[in-house]
Amino acid sequence: MFHITVLAVGRLKEKYLTEGAAEYLKRLSAYAKISVVEVEDGSLPENPAAAGGEKVKEKEGERLLGRLRPGTFLIALDVRGKMHSSEEMAEILNRLALSGRSDITFAIGGALGLSEKVLERAAMRLSFSRMTFPHQLVRLILLEQLYRWFKIARGEPYHY
């Protein structure tokens, strides 16, 4: 059985996000041991594009890296990552399982994204789109996609 960790900067605040995440976590429990680990997000400077923004991203990255389990297969969610279809991701998860890689961590950065150190540590960089999404919404999208990938892999109805 997979052990999947969603490692995220910040807490979900909006009710619709917390309710949606709770629903998909409940659904996913039939397919994997899944946990969500949140690390504190940094205070954004007035001008995040300035050097202060990089420092916030580095601090958040240190917090994320400090929560990684040894040997986990790290997938970084990054707008510059590679895009895959849901079917392709289901196949990637199958290949990881067949190769003995059942401990997988998905890292979601804060408002400024992931630090270079986190991106360098990642075995894979995944993008859901070339568009930018709020990092809290990305968590809900990831949980839905994880559920979809497991349904596809098992040939169960959900994905059409």
From Swiss-Prot:
Keywords noted in UniProt: Cytoplasm, Methyltransferase, rRNA processing, S-adenosyl-L-methionine, Transferase
Subcellular location(s) per record: Cytoplasm
Catalytic activity: pseudouridine(1915) in 23S rRNA + S-adenosyl-L-methionine = N(3)-methylpseudouridine(1915) in 23S rRNA + S-adenosyl-L-homocysteine + H(+)
Gene Ontology terms for molecular function: rRNA (pseudouridine-N3-)-methyltransferase activity
Documented EC number(s): 2.1.1.177
Positions of S-adenosyl-L-methionine binding: L77, G109, F128, S129, R130, M131, T132, F133
Entry GO terms, CC: cytoplasm
InterPro entries with a match to the protein in the record: Alpha/beta_knot_MTases, RlmH-like, tRNA_m1G_MTases_N
Known role: Specifically methylates the pseudouridine at position 1915 (m3Psi1915) in 23S rRNA.
This protein's name: Ribosomal RNA large subunit methyltransferase H
